[in-house]
A protein has these predicted regions:
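Short, well-structured N-terminal submotif of metal-dependent ribonuclease cores
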Residues: 1-27, 36-53, 116, 127
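Short amphipathic alpha-helical segments and helix-helix/interface helices
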Residues: 10-14, 96, 111
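Active-site neighborhoods of divalent-metal-dependent phosphate/nucleic-acid chemistry enzymes
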Residues: 20, 33-39, 57-105, 109
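Alpha-helix/helix-capping structural signal
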Residues: 26-29, 69, 112
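Short acidic-hydrophobic, aromatic-tinged amphipathic segments that line or gate anion-handling sites
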Residues: 64-65, 122-124
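Short, C-terminally biased terminal segments at protein or domain edges
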Residues: 112, 123-127
Length: 127
């Protein structure tokens, strides 16, 4: 997590309707885990406050969960990738499944793990 938000990402976010911005539940896991393994201190506390603000004030109720449809999409994608000899991190496969099930545009810097997933992807760091 960055101390200062990337200006390209902030500009891209400002151009999106607020109601269109959702977070996959898997991303919340990744963020909470990352904070959980950080050493205690002011940086961790500041980042935890920022994440709580994001979840409670900026995207309240807009969490895209790994439901049955998303799990099915992710499982099919994981099986396809394994058969092709190109497995990808499970968390990214679950995120792809959530995006596929909801027909969402996925904003990520990590295009590589989503190129073959059939998910529409945008890299807001390049805007």
């Amino acid at each position: 997590m960055q101390n200062v938000p990337d200006r390209h990402v902030m500009r891209w976010l400002d151009q999106q309707p607020v109601s269109d911005i959702w977070l996959p539940s898997v991303v919340i896991f990744e963020l909470r885990y990352g904070l959980g393994i950080m050493p205690a201190g002011s940086r961790r506390e500041r980042l935890e406050q920022g994440l709580n603000h994001l979840l409670n004030e900026l995207v309240p109720g807009r969490i895209a969960t790994l439901d049955g449809r998303a799990a099915q999409q992710a499982a099919q994608l994981a099986a396809k990738r394994k058969a092709q000899g190109t497995p990808v991190d499970l968390r990214d496969t679950l995120i792809a499944g959530i995006a596929l099930a909801s027909g969402a545009l996925l904003a990520t810097r990590n295009h590589r793990h989503f190129m073959d997933a059939g998910v529409a992807v945008v890299n807001p760091f390049n805007n």
